[in-house]
């Protein structure tokens, strides 16, 4: 028997599904979405999931997120599936994976790193060195960071 949807389907946009239960707000924060952009967003938290037991879902109307934009959420939602919806149909589906390179979003945790020096026009850059669990290295000072350290 099909159960009723808690939130209706969207016409165009992105559905982030299979988020670990309770992490939907963190996902929005990591994506830098505050709600003040005027996008129509639906959050569903702690609903039943066959794969995860319980899960969260985020539906963003009118914005198609790219893998580059969403891969960063793998730090807080490694199980997430991204669904791109057009005319009510899922036209693309992919799983998040740690990004190969992160530029300009996070600060290096090494206070002596050149990227933390005042008035240095250096963009913090981190390269993925290991996938499981994800480990990044600062391109400037060589300090290793887990994704959760950066966020
Ligand atoms: N969805 C939506 N609006 C649409 C189409 C899909 O909000 N127009 C949502 C569904 O509610 C679901 C997710 O997008 O949360 C994925 O949809 P779909 O691929 O149809 O579902 P499943 O086959 O169950 O997905 P999966 O195999 O990834 O579990």
From Swiss-Prot:
UniProt-listed SUPFAM superfamilies: Aspartate carbamoyltransferase, Regulatory-chain, C-terminal domain, Aspartate carbamoyltransferase, Regulatory-chain, N-terminal domain
Cofactor binding note from Swiss-Prot or TrEMBL: Binds 1 zinc ion per subunit.
Assigned keywords, A-Z: Metal-binding, Pyrimidine biosynthesis, Zinc
Gene3D superfamilies named among the record's database cross-references: Aspartate carbamoyltransferase regulatory subunit, C-terminal domain, Aspartate carbamoyltransferase regulatory subunit, N-terminal domain
Domain of life (superkingdom): Archaea
Keyword Iron attributed: no
Classification via InterPro entries: Asp_carbamoyltransf_reg_N, Asp_carbamoylTrfase_reg, Asp_carbamoyltrfase_reg_C, Asp_carbatrfase_reg_C_sf, Asp_carbatrfase_reg_N_sf
GO-annotated molecular function: metal ion binding
GO cellular component: aspartate carbamoyltransferase complex
Cofactor: Zn(2+)
GO biological process per UniProt: 'de novo' pyrimidine nucleobase biosynthetic process; pyrimidine nucleotide biosynthetic process
Record: residues binding Zn(2+): 108, 113, 138, 141
Protein role: Involved in allosteric regulation of aspartate carbamoyltransferase.
Subunit-level organization: Contains catalytic and regulatory chains.
Similarity section: Belongs to the PyrI family.
Descriptive protein name: Aspartate carbamoyltransferase regulatory chain
Gene that encodes it: pyrI
